[in-house]
Amino acid sequence: MKTTITTNGVDLAARSRHWHDAIGRAYFPLDLSFRRPEAFDGELTMWQLGQVSLSRLTSDALMYRRLPKHFREPGPEEFLVTLPAKAELRFAQGGKEVRANPGAFFIERSHEPYEFSHSE
């Protein structure tokens, strides 16, 4: 099954809240910091393939944070494999930091705090 969530058609003042809610439903609770919340654009397409899901996320500059407060309600332990397609991504978890360019990949662990950002 394919699902697409977009900010197109969402009032500018409501876009950052809309994106925050969409990301939480698609993945798990995260804090989001927008470079330009008043003019944010994003699109998330997801495919559910049994126990595995794929997603393609494109958006304006943004930082995602998975913090200890997000672990209050237990959930399944998940791993996300991230492959940048257009720009460098920055990811920090467990005292390590990675900057990945298109062609590289990294693994995110949902059950530990992390920080993920991109500037484009």
PLM region descriptions:
Residues 2-120:
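N-terminal functional module of multi-domain proteins
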